[in-house]
Amino acid sequence: GAPEISEFFKFFVETARSAGARVIDRNNLTIIEEDGFAYLPEYLAEHEVEIIASLPCYSAENVNKQRGNGVFDKSIAALKKLNAVGYGTSLTLHLVYNPLGPTLPGPQQQLEADYKEALQENFGIVFNSLFTITNQPIARFAEDLRKQEKWDWYLDLLANSFNASTVEGLMCRDTISVGYGGEIYDCDFNQMLGMQITNGNQLFLWDISPADLKDRAIQTG
């Protein structure tokens, strides 16, 4: 998705920043190359919005295979524009990697080094950090796993690769996901599954305060 498409995007950014809040834009990069959105690099820089951007690989072949023809070139063009206004140096620019298909990502530190070397040498692009994400078996990915008859195999892979040291840092422990209608979820994965936070009734953003969420049980699927 592209949150920048929302007619309320600027309102959210400016209201949150004026209140002193830290704002992070989960950016797909290609939006910057679409008609009507060329203003984004300068706008985001002006409001000191941190960017976490999707780039599933540093090679054109793999990116285009996962996200469609032409996506890699658009992503590189967008990254250059972000670098030009200070992202990756004075402003925060992180990239996100997730593997293609039912495999686990490689070691994050090594992948980050590989990304930085390839993007700097080939395109003169810099960024701050790389985050690796494991593909969750939900929505379209779940459908693909079943079609490939790899559903059980992938669930076994996830179970056998469980890392207890990651539990403390799970985003659902300190973050909620909000739907376009004000629905609240423990995380974006639960949002995809329609698992709205409840207290017997479905809850919306205007029904709660931060204190209401403290020590509550996180829903799992």
Predicted regions and their residues:
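Flexible glycine/acidic-rich beta-alpha junction loops that bind and position SAM and/or redox cofactors
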Residues: 35, 61-66, 92-108, 123-148
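Short, acidic, Ser/Thr-enriched surface-loop or helix-capping motifs
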Residues: 178-179
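C-terminal accessory region of radical SAM enzymes
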Residues: 126-158, 189-221
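Structural recognition of alpha->loop->beta junctions
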Residues: 38-54, 114-130
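Core AdoMet radical
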Residues: 1-5, 16-36, 43-79, 94-96
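Short, electropositive alpha-helical surface patch
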Residues: 12-22, 103-120, 153-155
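Hydrophobic "anchor" residues
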Residues: 183-184
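Short, basic/aromatic recognition patches
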Residues: 154-170
